[in-house]
């Protein structure tokens, strides 16, 4: 295989990877030959996923981790450093949470919940992984952002959008600051994707129809459609792409007005 399209011999950490988009990312990374460590807050889901990956012959290990805890983040990175001999090629900051409310109804706990999970954890993981990424000689960071960080999606709430917009900016900053260390940073911004977390939205007929009417492809995304882009950004073939926020949204963010029927 052309080395540009292989992750053979490379190592990766994916957060929140026992289900949903994170699970799909692990499957895609493993398919390209990467060795992967994952973390998840649910021990039950994590163990189930690890068993499934073992049956498929994937090189995946895992740790239970509450990413909102600074000591647990530090412990996780110590584990990763030990497993991968002080080197890491890929960091995928996938963990994300959402409490959808009108802005006037958010309380202090909601603010802390979003910031600590969606933003602070990703920021700290980048700091902790920097020496490992630099030592590897080829580092790639991918943030799982959202179209909510690019355009206003009122139904997702302003706090969620705030944290995702911040991740997009963090990708730009790190791309410039850490390029000299051989590290690239990008963000992927999906539309609504079919996962357990999005069911509250997709089961509401009026919300779903409203979203699909503004999405040229007329549907929600699939986890593997997001995973394929994430993994592409980690491949040597994408070595000149950094600092970008790429929307994978069925055309939502470019939709203006059209009298033509959707797909």
UniProtKB/Swiss-Prot annotation:
This is Tropinone reductase homolog At2g29300. Keywords: NADP, Oxidoreductase. Pfam families: adh_short_C2 (PF13561). GO terms for molecular function: oxidoreductase activity. PANTHER family: 3-OXOACYL-[ACYL-CARRIER-PROTEIN] REDUCTASE, TROPINONE REDUCTASE. It comes from the Eukaryota. InterPro entries: NAD(P)-bd_dom_sf, SDR_fam, TR. The active site is at residue 160. Gene3D superfamilies: NAD(P)-binding Rossmann-like Domain (3.40.50.720). Substrate binds at residue 146. NADP(+) binds at residues 13-37. Its EC number is 1.1.1.-. Belongs to the short-chain dehydrogenases/reductases (SDR) family. SDR65C subfamily.
């Amino acid at each position: 295989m052309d080395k540009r399209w292989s992750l053979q011999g490379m190592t990766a950490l994916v957060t929140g990877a026992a289900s949903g988009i994170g699970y799909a990312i692990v499957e895609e990374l493993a398919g390209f030959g990467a060795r992967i460590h994952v973390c998840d807050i649910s021990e039950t889901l994590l163990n189930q996923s690890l068993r499934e990956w073992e049956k498929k012959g994937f090189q995946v290990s895992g740790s239970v981790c509450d990413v909102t805890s600074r000591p647990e983040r530090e412990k996780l990175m110590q584990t990763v450093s030990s497993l991968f001999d002080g080197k890491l090629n890929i960091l995928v900051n996938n963990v994300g949470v959402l409490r959808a409310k009108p802005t006037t109804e958010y309380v202090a706990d909601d603010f802390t919940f979003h910031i600590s999970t969606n933003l602070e954890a990703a920021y700290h993981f980048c700091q902790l992984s920097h020496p490992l990424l630099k030592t590897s000689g080829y580092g790639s960071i991918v943030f799982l952002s959202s179209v909510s960080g690019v355009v206003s999606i009122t139904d997702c709430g302003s706090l969620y959008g705030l944290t995702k917009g911040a991740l997009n900016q963090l990708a730009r900053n790190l791309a410039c600051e850490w390029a000299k260390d051989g590290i690239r940073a990008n963000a992927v911004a999906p539309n609504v994707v079919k996962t357990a977390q999005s069911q509250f939205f997709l089961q509401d007929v009026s919300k779903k129809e409203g979203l699909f009417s503004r999405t040229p492809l007329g549907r929600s995304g699939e986890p593997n459609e997001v995973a394929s882009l994430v993994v592409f950004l980690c491949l040597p073939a994408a070595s000149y792409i950094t600092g970008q926020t790429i929307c994978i949204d069925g055309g939502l963010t470019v939709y203006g007005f059209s009298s033509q029927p959707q797909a």
